[in-house]
Amino acid sequence: MSRIEGVLKALKEQGRKALIPYITAGDPHPEETVSLMHTLVSAGADIIELGVPFSDPMADGPVIQLACERALKHGTSLRQVMAMVKEFRKTDPDTPVVLMGYLNPMEAMGYEAFADAAADAGVDGVLTVDLPPEEADQVAPLFADRHLDPVFLLAPTTTDERIKAISEHSSGYVYYVSIKGVTGSATIDVDEVAKKVAHVHELTALPVGVGFGIRDAETAAAVGRVSDGVIVGSVLVDTIARHQTDPDALRNALTDLLHPMREALDSLAH
């Protein structure tokens, strides 16, 4: 059982929902990332999605695009991101880390070298936004051999046939994108999400995490009621942007944002 599967299984047994925050590695500065990861855990994170900065993040809205720009300006590379995870692992052997990014940096490193480096660093899962599961044949065995969970995205428009195909190629959890469009856009329709997630659950045994549109404790609780976990990204990255010159204020602001979400999710426990 992978670290991700273990955490999600334990939460399910407790009747609790996963809180999965996203930050971009290297933003606001590479030296800050490991400390921010620990802050997320202290504030209640169960799993961390760590973004690998890329120059053309096409699925992301302006908030995360700017975070990628800030990180790349500081020279944050894929190998540096691996080093950050390795450093994080020295004092946190338990919290799963999922690398989230685009195919290009992985291809540039080489799939096998990437899988080796990820496993060595203590990475638990990989979500590659622009890698369709049917094209993942090259990486799937490399990930499986190293106990890395491949995580894939489901959209509101994903067909049943495709949901089943994605489920077959996935492990750990699947990431349901609640809104059509880029990250940070629009308002979430919880009733619509509830219907879609219930339908996804009919087609896959994997836990379903829901992201896009979760901005506060209220939306976290609403989405948590109908899913296995909530994924919070743009609002955290926006907070980082607003406090990028003051590390202490930044950590406090992230805690103030995330901790009420944790409490709201735990209030749903049964």
Swiss-Prot record:
It comes from the Bacteria. GO terms for molecular function: tryptophan synthase activity. Signal peptide: none annotated. One of its GO terms (cellular component) is cytosol. Keywords: Amino-acid biosynthesis, Aromatic amino acid biosynthesis, Lyase, Tryptophan biosynthesis. PROSITE patterns: TRP_SYNTHASE_ALPHA. It holds the Pfam family Trp_syntA. Its EC number is 4.2.1.20. The keyword Lyase applies. The active site is at 49 (proton acceptor), 60 (proton acceptor). Pathway: Amino-acid biosynthesis; L-tryptophan biosynthesis; L-tryptophan from chorismate: step 5/5. It catalyses: (1S,2R)-1-C-(indol-3-yl)glycerol 3-phosphate + L-serine = D-glyceraldehyde 3-phosphate + L-tryptophan + H2O. Tetramer of two alpha and two beta chains. The alpha subunit is responsible for the aldol cleavage of indoleglycerol phosphate to indole and glyceraldehyde 3-phosphate. Belongs to the TrpA family. This is Tryptophan synthase alpha chain. It comes from Marinobacter nauticus (strain ATCC 700491 / DSM 11845 / VT8).
